[in-house]
């Protein structure tokens, strides 16, 4: 998965074969050193792709009701039954969360520890993120259910929704900003068509803010990817707004979310699962959001040809958002898509992009 441990580094590649679905976190340095084997699959398929597992290492929390998966349930839950050996670390500082439970009968080895869970904090929100957030905020209706990724852009989006009412959350990951928005009453989950009153997620990805908020809080449930990412579940959520990122998008709507500068730094991940879910949702909005440029403004992220793989095909593209506006590609032919994509590119690159598209 997305590794945060210092043990995941190129220096250990001689002793450990590193394999992951993503090039994020500590994986990035291993990937840039060409020591990371990539497993390109959708999040819904990850547990099956990893099965069978020889040894499964889990960190859990213990309470009167039993063992909770604590910070992360997601693809770990289905692997418990198939793993040859399940090693469990019971951390008394881990939040005890509602949702999935670990059956004591499935534990082979148990170790008790006491250590603060790892914390991940996003970069500061800048003007570009705020501009993108304003565009997205104009699309979101009161009562919508949101799925967001992690980082400064999703946090900017949530910040920009403070005047909205009765928002819901059904997401792969949630962080401190979700806890803050629940505490102030913007996120109530009261109008969700399924799981009313409950924020549903697969992993807590933040700091003490979300850990303290989620601890023994029945309004937050940690669920397996078999639930959080399943199309059959997502299609039942009315007004599902999914907001994911990309490295670059071409003029037809093809999305590269995996490779930048020749290195694997992203993932296929859950973006496609959620995009398809939003397409299937009544009133849903499948959104891909990204800054218009990279490398200090010297490279356009709206391109005429992708420099990496097609993580999402153009047939599944929905709305593309940059700081310059929204390109709704749904129902558009290729020529109209190109026009709309050029319009949200940085002004310095629009002429060249239009010329490449024959506009």
PLM regions and their residue ranges:
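Conserved alpha/beta enzyme-core scaffold
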Residues: 1-359
